[in-house]
Swiss-Prot record:
Annotated protein name in UniProt: Transmembrane protein 231
Family, as annotated: Belongs to the TMEM231 family.
Membrane topology classification: Multi-pass membrane protein
GO BP terms, alphabetized: camera-type eye development; cilium assembly; embryonic digit morphogenesis; neuroepithelial cell differentiation; regulation of protein localization; smoothened signaling pathway; vasculature development
PANTHER family hit by this protein: CHST5 PROTEIN, TRANSMEMBRANE PROTEIN 231
Quaternary context: Part of the tectonic-like complex (also named B9 complex).
Keywords tagged on the record: Cell membrane, Cell projection, Cilium, Cilium biogenesis/degradation, Glycoprotein, Membrane, Transmembrane, Transmembrane helix
Subcellular location: Cell projection, Cilium membrane
Protein source organism: Gallus gallus
Residues passing through the membrane, by range: 23-43, 266-286
Highest taxon, organism lineage: Eukaryota
Described purpose of this protein according to its UniProt entry: Transmembrane component of the tectonic-like complex, a complex localized at the transition zone of primary cilia and acting as a barrier that prevents diffusion of transmembrane proteins between the cilia and plasma membranes. Required for ciliogenesis and sonic hedgehog/SHH signaling.
A cellular-component GO term for this protein: ciliary transition zone
Glycosites: N195, N200, N222
Length: 320
């Protein structure tokens, strides 16, 4: 009896033998190819086989750096503004337009999880009775860190701007410091690309403090934060000797962070997809294989059922 055992199935109680180059062996090979290759094509062609991006949620570790730049517009003219910042070089450039405000800030950890949840910021700008504020531009600088996947450290800002035709007494803003991603973060490692100051406080040049240039350089970054309050509240009717007040609440919400999955995560998802489709093919082609051999579609030598001997019987047979 030539050949090797090609197929057996517990339900059939028969073994089928044939030569390695027989039609049955070729059919078996073809069935194997049809079982294992198409699931790969199906998984691949149905998109999302290789995981390109993934997401997770994390509340960032945000701290106000006690750095800010403030410009209050007092009229329509080009030089009618008052300004102050925490950068001495900027303040030196302002000369008589420099006006030091009174600041109070408080960061609050509302749920006691060790991460700050919001910043209460209040700025009181003393004004002469003849001065009026018609616009506010404010940059607050934060240190912003993510730890769950890659360690991402950056200095970022909240920019608040409001103009009104009516002189104001107070500007009230309340919003989120939202993460804005133009690029996926890494899944591991340390990323300090943007751990650079938003405002170059050591520069003596006025152009480095031009809001237009600061915003342009900041927006060039692939990862930024934006302050989301699109509708701050402008209050009018300031008393003659009262300061102009900026009152802002800046929240640090939990963010959905998009990242580039690592090698093993990519392989895992590809494997899960492949195997789940493969199971269906294994079942279907298992049936086909059984049919082909049971019905002798290709010539094979069926070997009659070898009934398992009971241990007692086999023991007795070996007795001398
Ligand atoms: C980020 O920058 C700050 C200030 O320049 C520095 O103190 C800190 O060590 C830097 N962090 C990392 C991880 O490089
Ligand atoms: C800040 O400005 C100074 C002077 O122009 C320059 O030498 C320095 O490289 C700048 N720093 C950054 C971080 O751009
Ligand atoms: C920003 O993202 C673009 C496109 O994803 C990339 O080509 C560029 O290198 C990134 N810039 C930095 C500084 O990482």
């Amino acid at each position: 009896m030539a050949g090797v055992e090609l197929f057996s199935h517990p339900a059939l109680h028969t073994r089928y033998r044939a030569g390695l180059c027989s039609a049955a062996a070729l059919a078996l090979l073809l069935i194997a190819v049809l079982t294992y290759v198409p699931p790969l094509l199906v998984a691949y062609r149905s998109h999302g086989f290789w995981l390109k991006q993934s997401a997770y949620r994390e509340q960032p570790t945000v701290r106000f750096r006690y750095e800010l730049l403030f410009v209050a517009t007092t009229g329509p003219g080009p030089g009618s503004f008052l300004a102050w910042s925490t950068f001495p070089a900027f303040n030196r450039l302002q000369e008589d337009r420099l006006r030091v405000p009174l600041l109070s800030t408080r960061e609050e950890d509302k749920n006691q999880d060790g991460k700050m949840d919001q910043l209460h910021f209040k700025l009181e700008l003393p004004l002469q009775p003849t001065e009026h504020v018609v616009g506010v531009q404010l940059i607050l600088i934060f240190s912003y860190q993510l730890y769950r996947m890659s360690t991402f450290v950056m200095q970022s800002m909240a920019f608040l701007q409001f103009f009104s035709p009516v002189p104001g007494s107070q500007l009230y803003a309340n919003g989120d410091l939202k993460l804005n991603q133009r690029q996926l973060l890494n899944h591991c490692g340390l990323d300090t690309r943007y751990n650079v100051s938003v405002v170059n406080g050591t520069s003596p040049f006025a152009s480095d403090y031009d809001l237009k240039n600061i915003i342009a350089a900041y927006r060039d970054r692939n990862v930024t934060t934006v302050f989301s309050d699109s509708n701050p509240i402008w209050m009018t009717g300031r008393g003659a000797n009262t300061p102009f007040i900026v009152n802002a609440t800046i929240r640090y919400p939990v963010e959905v962070i998009l990242y580039q999955p690592g090698f093993w995560e990519t392989i895992k998802f590809a494997w899960i997809q492949y195997v789940s489709i493969l199971l269906i093919f294994l079942w279907v082609f298992g049936r086909i294989k059984m049919f082909v051999f049971q019905n002798q579609v290709f010539a094979t030598t069926p070997v009659s059922p070898v009934l398992p001997l009971s241990p007692v019987l086999s023991y007795k047979q070996h007795q001398p």
